[in-house]
């Protein structure tokens, strides 16, 4: 592999040190290595902001691992940044001097505002959804809050609170009592109050979280079969569960890993304060943050206005998808959707996910015609899809699995991006669009009227179409039968 196409970003955080190594490929990035080590640097800061020798040694030990991988990468294509703890530490110079010797490249201590800007860039390059967003990143010793539209930030704040510092300050007795949470939340709201008005003034349509705390919440919700949107009600529910556990060392929540458990209650308290103070309705997980911001900055790639479209184009190229056919199926599915939208009330994001499934429905053919839907589902489940959340990927895979043949209803109910009934409706429309676009020519797609009454679909074809298309009639009869097996009434006229 040509080393000139390799780039590395290292983030010396207050809780963890991270390294990301990527390869530039066709205007996007392909992840080659991700290494994360819990160093808990912030825990080594005393009241005088002096970093302990033990904490520094933990950091240097981690950097020796990273250094081995950096030897293969040209120095101009490496960026190493240090954040909150090394901004605060009075003896940061000692740590950084040795860190630079170990890594063989410069280490830059960045300001809180620069950290916030880079986090926003990482989100803008990797996260789909509405353009106007609020980005929240709860680190070990600082929390970044950024508003922006597209690639442009409108306000940037870096606040002195984080999951490690709040752990040491409000959960040092290791008790998970209501009082501990109350104190931690009140303190976080006090820190937030001076910046809340400006954030609200700029406003946002979507809120995304880009930190270990939000990642942990996502993992918990996926494990417990909830949908992926984080809401205040869910956060309060998890807080009550933590309080029931009583002690930090006894904290057990389905989906919460041991590695994340230590700083979970403190991160949760900060997030509850942010939701309450800013009146956030819901939050989803970002596709990338600081490290991705560093990498895309080195590559000088423009922020794509529609990340999901870029992702679909890249995958279609990679798996040699017939884009004319993908567009034909998408156009037909969209036509069907418009005809039933008054009855089914499908939301815009669900429509977008249906059309994404149409664009990718034939990628399984690149493996083999036999079991192509299984291959398509497998590929989508395991590919990196910038712009799509983990739950959305799971829904896409489930739709592709059920694009033809008998329906696996349980898989449609196990995804948690949309309610089960909506997943069933999207699946029905996808199957019909694929069936009627099967001749692969625009002039051979019949004029179809589709009506929905609750779950009953009535499909009306031109007068003598069925009589002149015996194979088409056979395929439609078979589809009616498959849909009836799972109690989806389909009446063809």
Swiss-Prot record:
NCBIfam families: PRK11031.1. Pathway: Purine metabolism; ppGpp biosynthesis; ppGpp from GTP: step 2/2. It holds the Pfam family Ppx-GppA_III. One of its GO terms (molecular function) is guanosine-5'-triphosphate,3'-diphosphate diphosphatase activity. Keywords: Hydrolase. Belongs to the GppA/Ppx family. GppA subfamily. The gene is gppA. This is Guanosine-5'-triphosphate,3'-diphosphate pyrophosphatase. PANTHER family: EXOPOLYPHOSPHATASE, RETROGRADE REGULATION PROTEIN 2. The keyword Hydrolase applies. Catalyzes the conversion of pppGpp to ppGpp. Guanosine pentaphosphate (pppGpp) is a cytoplasmic signaling molecule which together with ppGpp controls the 'stringent response', an adaptive process that allows bacteria to respond to amino acid starvation, resulting in the coordinated regulation of numerous cellular activities. GO terms for biological process: guanosine pentaphosphate catabolic process; guanosine tetraphosphate biosynthetic process; nucleobase-containing small molecule interconversion. Its EC number is 3.6.1.40. The lineage of its organism: Bacteria, Pseudomonadati, Pseudomonadota, Gammaproteobacteria, Enterobacterales. InterPro entries: ATPase_NBD, GppA/Ppx_hydrolase, Guo-5TP_3DP_PyrP, Ppx_GppA_C, Ppx_GppA_N, PyroPPase_GppA_Ppx. It catalyses: guanosine 3'-diphosphate 5'-triphosphate + H2O = guanosine 3',5'-bis(diphosphate) + phosphate + H(+).
